[in-house]
């Protein structure tokens, strides 16, 4: 399979382009198989995905500055067959530009396939495919919620540690055309200027408090004014007043975040000044939520593509919703 222009040199920097294409081919082969079919890459292939993508993350800013058109996806949580459906619907890279808002691993059954495909696309299309850090891209969290166990069962703990080194270098926010600010969690009382995001150190673990913690953990709160307690026991909740204040101060139009299951896959807050996007339908098999992806066109108009929750045991359908 011939590599796309630029994939060999630029995209495959530090990784053999033929090998990279073969890894992507194997990961996509299961599209036609039963959902849940595993793809067994070798340990050495996965290590390469981690180390090469890590260098790319570090070479790009911690606050990514991106341009529309772009498609934005929320939490995936190891639901690999749903990730493949998102791409089938939005177009497989490089057909569309993508920004993912974090939480690739844990809870679902196929965290390894999920993160490997995302890292492979990052290496192949470094200027068109972007990944932010979620609160689950952190050793103390994914040690508990499934990723560690999956790595240990299918490979070994050493490989989990290689992923940790990679996750510690993920960028934490993105700004689209200077108007849409994206992160996994939300706002922080410690965020007064966007440059503060740029100067957060990497590699780094996620601390228990402070700006980085809040960007990955905070939530909007319907009955909150200002800053409130967060039921998660980490970070804060913030009211609609804080959203309006922040947008006005920084001349922004919208905050786009993930981090919470929402029934329709997307949900507005603060008079459409903030949107939550969640891309794992039937989350954990326990919710009947839809998944969504937000498309931002050149004029910054946002529309939503919905992955409906499956009929029990059935395939699920897609519908386009404004």
Curated annotation (Swiss-Prot):
Highest taxon of source: Eukaryota
Database matches in Pfam families: Metallophos, STPPase_N
Family indicated by similarity: Belongs to the PPP phosphatase family. PP-1 subfamily.
Listed name of the protein: Serine/threonine-protein phosphatase PP1
InterPro entries: Calcineurin-like_PHP_ApaH, Metallo-depent_PP-like, PP1_catalytic_subunit, Ser/Thr-sp_prot-phosphatase, STPPase_N
Tagged with keyword Nucleotidyltransferase: no
Lineage: Eukaryota, Viridiplantae, Streptophyta, Embryophyta, Tracheophyta
Organism of this sequence: Oryza sativa subsp. japonica (Rice)
Coiled coil: none
GO cellular component: cytoplasm; nucleus
Active site: 136
Keyword list, A-Z: Hydrolase, Manganese, Metal-binding, Protein phosphatase
Catalytic activity: O-phospho-L-seryl-[protein] + H2O = L-seryl-[protein] + phosphate; O-phospho-L-threonyl-[protein] + H2O = L-threonyl-[protein] + phosphate
Gene3D superfamilies the record matches: 3.60.21.10
